[in-house]
Amino acid sequence: MAALAVLRYAGSSPLLWGWGPILFGLLGSVFVLLLPLVGIEEQCCATLKGLALLRCQMWGGIQRPVVHTTSLAVPFTALDLLPQKVKPSKETQLEAKAALQQALEMKKSGKREKAHKLLVHALNMNPEFVEALTELGTILEEEKDVVQADHLYTKALAISPCHEKALVSRDRTLPLVEEIDQRHFGIIDGKVRRLMSIPKGNSALRRVMEETYYHHIYHTVAIEGNTLTLSEIRHIIETRYAVPGKSLQEQNEAIGVDVAMKYINTTLLSRDGAITVNDILEIHRRVLGYADPVEAGRFRVNQVFVGHHIPPHPQDLDKHMQELVQWLNSEETLHLHPVEFAALAHYKLVYVHPFVDGNGRTSRLLMNLILMQASYPPITIRKEQRAEYYAALDTANEGDVRPFIRFIAKCTEMTLDTLLIATTEHAVGLPGASNHACPDCKQTIPVHS
C-alpha cells in the first residue's frame, strides 16, 4: 500500500501524465502473470484491483467509449456521438436485478448453465446492466471463451469506466485476446504469402480473380437490398444493356460499383502519396454517379439517423473527414496490421456517414483499396453475412470495434481460401458463379446514356 501511495503522489506530476497509463498497464500485466502462483492469488487480485481503482482516481473515467483495436487505441472524435437508446423501465430493471441474484445463487450452487441463462435473461431486459455483463463475462472466461468475456468487460467499462471488477477482469483478459487476434493475423499473412507465390500468369488464378470481381459487385449491392442476380450483373457490366423487368435504379447501382472499382484499380493503386478527402469523394462520385448523379461526390446537407446511431451534423462533416484522412495517413496506422487498418478505415468512414447514400459501398471500396495497397486481395462481404456484418458495426458503435475487425479478418480469410482452392489441381468455380449468360437478358436499351 505504501507503493500505491507513492504512485498516487507521483501521478500529480505533469511528467507522468503521458506515461501513467502505460506504467499501470505494465504493472497490471506483471500481476496477471503472478496470479497462478500458489499462495499469492488473493494478494495479487487485491493489488490488481487497487491499481485499477487508483488508475481511475488519477486519470479519471472515460466519458465516452473509445475505439479499442486489437493492438492500438486510436482516438477518433467522431465517436463523440453515441447511440441513443431508451432506458428500461424501473420494473424491468428490478426484474433484471432479481435475475442477477438468482444467477449468483445458481453459480454458487454449481448450476453454471442455469446461471448463464439467467444472466442472458437479465441482459435481454437491461442490456446496459454492468453487473450482469461482468458476471456473464466471468462465467464465459471460466468456460475458456476469453474473447467474448473480454468483450463483455469492455462493454461494461464503456458504460461504467471505473467499475472495479470489470477493470480487474479486463486487465486480465486483454493480453490474452490480443495474442489470439495477432495469431489469427499471422495465419492470414501465411495464406497471403501462398497466394503471392502463385505466378500472375496462372490461368486458374486469372479466371477466379475475374469471377471474384463480379462476385464483389453482386454481394456489395445485394447487402443493401439490390435484387439483381449474379448472372444479370455480369450481363449488365459486360454489355451495358439493361435486363428486362428489373429496376434501372438497381442496374445503375451495379454499374456505379464497377466504375468505382475500375477507378481504384487504374488510378489510385498506381499512384503514390496520401489518401485524400478528394479521393474518397471521387470513389463516391462513381459509386452513385449512375443511380443518383445529383448527390454523387458531395457531402450530405441534412442530418441523418441510422438506427440508434446519430452521425455528425452536416456542418461538422468537413472537420470529421479531414480528421479521417489525417488518421489514414498517420504514423499510427503503420503499426496496425493491414486487415486491422482496413477494417478501422471502413468503420470510421461509415460512422461519419458523410453521404446521403452509398456510404457502405464507398466504405467497402476504401477498405479494399487499403488491403490492395498492402498486397492483399480485395475481399468480399457476402450478402449471407449481412446480419453478422451489421451486428458487428452496431457493436463497434457501442464502444468495442474489435468484433468488427475480427469479422473483416474472417472475410479476408474466406476470400483467401476461395482463391487458393480455386488454383489447386481440382479447382471448382466460386459458389453461385455461372459461365452462362443471363438467359432472359437481351440487348435492349442502354442502362445509362
From Swiss-Prot:
Reaction(s) catalysed (UniProt annotation): L-tyrosyl-[protein] + ATP = O-(5'-adenylyl)-L-tyrosyl-[protein] + diphosphate; L-threonyl-[protein] + ATP = 3-O-(5'-adenylyl)-L-threonyl-[protein] + diphosphate
Documented activity regulation: Adenylyltransferase activity is inhibited by the inhibitory helix present at the N-terminus: Glu-224 binds ATP and competes with ATP-binding at Arg-364, thereby preventing adenylyltransferase activity. Activation dissociates ATP-binding from Glu-224, allowing ordered binding of the entire ATP moiety with the alpha-phosphate in an orientation that is productive for accepting an incoming target hydroxyl side chain.
Pfam families: Fic (PF02661)
Residue ranges annotated for the Fido domain, each copy included: 275-410
GO annotations of cellular component type: membrane
Localisation: Membrane
Annotated residues for binding of ATP: E224, E250, Q251, G358, N359, G360, R364
Main location: membrane
Function: Adenylyltransferase that mediates the addition of adenosine 5'-monophosphate (AMP) to specific residues of target proteins.
Protein name, per record: Protein adenylyltransferase FICD
Taxonomy of the source species: Eukaryota, Metazoa, Chordata, Craniata, Vertebrata
Gene that this polypeptide is encoded by: ficd
